[in-house]
A protein has these predicted regions:
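Acidic/polar-rich alpha-helix caps and helix-coil junctions
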Residues: 6-72, 76, 80, 88-318
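Single conserved hydrophobic/aromatic residue that forms the stacking wall/gate
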Residues: 1-5
Length: 318
């Protein structure tokens, strides 16, 4: 399917978010790390699980580091590009140029705003009572070059592991299914949706206020952004990327913004390879990402076209 006209979408999005806000049933929780855990005032649409009676899931088995006692995790690990998207605690952009080569200097992880540590496992942080290493041969979080082995085996190819969405209280990952909730819609997303729609509808002050409300969450406490126009939208894009990280939004956001073919073509992902305290900036997999413009519309299945002579394929897919 293709997308509706922008103006109608913006009005619909604004009105829908406004109606939710007016219910006064939802709010931001103080601790960002609790925002996606469900059973709180931020969760709007939540799917619950039970490890014993079911339904349950295996998210932890897919993403935990090897030191959790399970050898088949870390199927996806955060990239250096994602890490560099985080501002410092004062809301400023961090200069990572020194780590775009080889250095023994410790990265500025402790300077980054609170949502970073709540989202990503990095060298020196604590995970399930262990200080993480994330290095070549590391005991707690080992590094592995891309395709060094046939499977991930719980090792990182970027120097990082995912923390967000995992159950830190789950000790027996190998023998126990996961039961943490999946929050499909939470109030922070509603505020950001409304902010974006307000921006499109030239409600600049309201857009700023809504985004700054998310940034000002009690446990995050980032200063507000006063930018406007295209500069505000760029700030908004990054704010949405950080706040909703790994919740399944960014790819679809880039599609609806019609920016994927610009930023996701010939795009490569990087990481930090850590060897005996030396940090080396690396190309994670040596592959260019591709996003041809025809991916903005989904093709009509060939079987449907064969079954109905009146159906035509989209021009992009002919």
């Amino acid at each position: 399917h293709s997308f509706p006209t922008r103006r109608s979408s913006d009005l619909d999005a604004y009105d829908a978010a406004d109606e939710v806000e007016k219910l006064q049933l939802y709010d931001l929780v103080d601790n960002y790390a609790d925002a996606w855990k469900g059973n709180n005032k931020e969760a709007i649409l939540e799917f619950d699980y039970n490890k014993d009676s079911g339904p349950n899931h295996t998210f932890d088995q897919y993403y935990v580091p090897q030191c959790d006692g399970y050898d088949f995790g870390a199927l996806g690990t955060p990239t250096q590009e994602m890490v560099e998207s985080y501002e410092d605690k004062n809301g400023n952009k961090v200069d990572w140029s020194e780590w775009h080569g080889t250095t023994t200097k410790e990265p500025p992880y402790d300077q980054l705003e609170p949502r970073f540590a709540a989202t990503i496992i990095y060298r020196g942080c604590t995970w399930k009572g262990r200080v993480m290493d994330c290095s070549v041969g590391g005991t707690n979080g080992a590094f592995m070059a891309y395709r060094e082995q046939s499977y991930s085996y719980g090792k990182t190819t970027t120097g990082y592991f995912l923390r967000k969405l995992l159950d830190e209280k789950l000790i027996d990952v190998k023998g126990t299914k996961s039961s943490q909730a999946w929050v499909e819609i939470r109030f922070a997303e509603v505020l950001l949706n409304k902010a974006e729609a307000a921006y499109r509808l030239n409600k600049t002050t309201e857009a700023q206020s809504l985004m700054n409300r998310v940034r000002g969450r009690q446990g995050v406490n980032l200063p507000g952004k006063s930018s406007s126009g295209e500069a505000w939208f760029n700030d908004y894009r990054n704010e949405r990327k950080i706040e909703l990280a790994y919740e399944g939004h960014l790819f679809w956001d880039m599609r609806r913004w019609r920016l994927a073919h610009i930023e996701y073509n010939n795009y490569r992902c990087h990481g930090l390879k850590i060897t005996n305290g030396t940090y080396e900036y690396i190309d994670c997999d040596g592959q260019d990402r591709k996003f041809p413009q025809k991916l903005y519309v989904l093709p009509v299945p060939t079987s449907e076209i064969k079954n109905n002579a009146l159906i035509e394929q989209y021009d992009e897919w002919k």
